[in-house]
Amino acid sequence: MAYATILMIFSVVALMSGERAHAAVDCSSLILNMADCLSFVTSGSTVVKPEGTCCSGLKTVVRTGPECLCEAFKNSGSLGLTLDLSKAASLPSVCKVAAPPSARCGLSVSGDPPATAPGLSPTAGAGAPALSSGANAATPVSSPRSSDASLLSVSFAFVIFMALISSFY
């Protein structure tokens, strides 16, 4: 049951990343190759090495559409999924996959948030809004919202995906 939940969350992330990725690569299906990586990169996970087909899935994503990897990491917070950025950044070296800089998403293995990826901070929840430096610390700055059309297409894809998953149970 827990595996099905993790797979569902990862699939929704993949569907959302497909909305924003280049049209030449189908990120939604490509990221599903990395479903076994989620147990390793989820914040608070005690898994010490990637499981199952994680590394072969990572290799497929890096070879086919490395930008999809970054999109999945960036969109994970919108689903309430918090990632351990140190583990996420270490995936290529742990899996012995040569990843181009675009597949590293600006993440550093030390866990320090890079200047190029402010939405991926290990100190705040991945979905937490950023705080303005001049504002009261209790007042969050509104994040830009996606258009209603994009939200509708993700919702429709989610309904289709859930129907598919429920047919197996």
Swiss-Prot record:
Lipid positions (GPI-anchor amidated serine)? S146
Signal peptide start-end: 1-23
Q: Please describe what happens when the gene is knocked out.
A: No obvious defects in morphology. Plants lacking both XYP1 and XYP2 have morphological defects in vascular development; e.g. discontinuous and thicker veins with the improper interconnection of tracheary elements (TEs).
Gene Ontology biological process: lipid transport; xylem development
Tissue distribution of the protein: Expressed in a vascular-specific manner, mainly in roots, and, to a lower extent, in hypocotyls, seedlings stems and flowers.
List, alphabetically, the Pfam families matched. Answer: LTP_2 (PF14368)
**Superkingdom as given in the UniProt entry:** Eukaryota
What residue ranges are annotated as transmembrane?
none
Asked if the record carries the keyword Cell membrane, the reply is: yes
Q: Which Cys-Cys disulphide bridges does the record give?
A: C27-C70, C37-C54, C55-C95, C68-C105
Q: Which UniProt keywords apply?
A: Cell membrane, Disulfide bond, Glycoprotein, GPI-anchor, Lipoprotein, Membrane, Secreted, Signal
Which SMART domains does this one have? AAI
An annotated Gene Ontology molecular function = lipid binding
- Propeptide residues, chain positions: 147-169
Recorded family membership? Belongs to the plant LTP family.
- Report the function annotation for this chain: Probable lipid transfer protein. Proteoglycan-like factor that exhibits xylogen activity consisting in mediating local and inductive cell-cell interactions required for xylem differentiation.
**Name of this protein:** Non-specific lipid transfer protein GPI-anchored 11
Write the gene name. Answer: LTPG11
